[in-house]
Structure formats: structure tokens, C-alpha cells
Amino acid sequence: MRKVRFRSRTEHTLDTKGRLNFPRRFSDVLESFESQDLIIAPFKTHLRIYPLAEWEELETKMHNHGGEQNLSGWVRYVVGGVVEAALDKQGRLLIPQTLRLDAGLEKNVVLNGMLSWIEIWDATAWASEQQAVRDGFEDFSEGLRNMGIL
């Protein structure tokens, strides 16, 4: 059976209450999970949305290895900032104000599928990030070769 993944990116606008119209292609992927519950987590320059099952796998990794390599501060930041969420009846996701402020999200945002999770970026920050990736594309060559992609 083919595993369903979050792929592609879309531009969206947050409404005045911080709600986001969740793209149908992402909600279709979400339907493949037992639970429709989501976890929204802060991640320095953006937010990440995880299906609950994916988040629980990450929590297990953090529990087993979070004390290693001085990761306790990172675990504290991420786990302390998570919010459990679900889509409303209109298919919208409420992004709490604390998380919007933390990630610098104002109105225009980009949702980017990352296979197991979705990123939410401020549109301006996303453009800067993409330019930095394009400028340093050669830096990925060795890793891509090791994966058999190049």
C-alpha cells in the first residue's frame, strides 16, 4: 500500500482571527491517519503541523534521546510551545496568537509539505529561505549522491 505524504506548497492568507483555510490536498492526506488531531509546533523561523501519530513518533525520539547532545533546551522550546488543534467544520485551522507571533506570521503565509509534516512560513521569510537554498544548492550534492538521487 502506498504511503500518503504531504507534498507541494501553497500560498494562503490568515484571517483576522488567525485561521487558515487548510488545503484540500493536505486534508486528504490527514484522512489517511486514524486521528484527525493535529499538533502545531514552533520551529525557530516557522511552524510545523504534524498529524498526531507523526508527532507521537517524534515525542518518542525526544524522550529517548532528548538529553543527548544538549538538546534539552530545544525540547523545552518545541514541546513547551506545541498546541493541539483540529480543523473546524469549515476546514480551517486556528493558529494561536502566541505561535503566530513566535513565527512572525502576519497575514500572507506559505504552507509547504515536507512529507511527514507541513511547514507554515511567513511569505517574506519563505522567499528569503528559498533564495538562500537556491544560492547554496551545490551544498546538497554530497548528501543527494549518498541517497542515490544524483
From Swiss-Prot:
GO terms for cellular component: cytoplasm; nucleoid. The keyword Transcription applies. Residues 9-54, 82-125 form the SpoVT-AbrB domain. GO terms for molecular function: DNA-binding transcription factor activity; transcription cis-regulatory region binding. InterPro entries: MraZ (IPR003444), MraZ_C (IPR035644), MraZ_dom (IPR020603), MraZ_N (IPR035642), MraZ_sf (IPR038619), SpoVT-AbrB_dom (IPR007159), SpoVT-AbrB_sf (IPR037914). GO terms for biological process: negative regulation of DNA-templated transcription initiation. It is found in: Cytoplasm, Nucleoid. It comes from the Bacteria. Disulfide bonds: none annotated. Keywords: Cytoplasm, DNA-binding, Repeat, Transcription, Transcription regulation. Its main location: cytoplasm. Belongs to the MraZ family. Forms oligomers. This is Transcriptional regulator MraZ. It comes from Desulfotalea psychrophila (strain LSv54 / DSM 12343). The gene is mraZ.
